[in-house]
A protein has these predicted regions:
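Bacterial Sec-dependent N-terminal signal peptides
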Residues: 1-21
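Extracellular glycan-recognition regions
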Residues: 20-133
Length: 133
């Protein structure tokens, strides 16, 4: 089963526009402060948390909060993601996750003072791709 993961590493607001309701989703690494208001999820994310596995950077983490729903087969998702990006590597986006060794995360990431489209593909080890917006 694949899990659609909605998560971030910055203050995050996500608005769902499909039949899936936020109230039916679940937390992994639940943040200390979050709320659902008017079909939008807002959270304050734990600093220095992330998803990354075994690479030449020398660390593995699987500790950022994310809110997810489990789907099998084909599905479609549409979300609006906003964040208060302040620190290097702050990010907000989506994750498709099978388990801790197999996932894809994509979103907007703040690197060296610039906003970037960022994607990490993980199949046992993580590989990062980034392009300036």
């Amino acid at each position: 089963m694949k899990k659609m993961i909605l998560g971030a590493l910055a203050f995050l607001s996500i608005q769902m526009t499909s039949a899936q309701t936020l109230e039916k989703m679940q937390w992994f690494n639940e943040p200390a402060k979050w709320e659902i208001n008017d079909k939008a999820l807002s959270m304050f994310v734990t600093p220095q948390s992330d998803y990354w596995r075994i690479s030449h950077y020398g660390f593995t983490v699987d500790d950022a909060p994310f809110y997810y729903a489990t789907y099998g087969g084909e599905f479609e998702v549409k979300v609006k993601v906003t964040g208060e990006y302040k620190a290097r590597f702050d990010q907000a986006g989506l994750m498709l996750r099978i388990d801790h060794e197999n996932y894809i995360k994509a979103g907007i990431e703040f690197v060296d003072g610039k906003f970037n489209l960022s994607t990490v593909v993980t199949h046992k080890t993580s590989d990062w791709s980034v392009i300036s917006l």
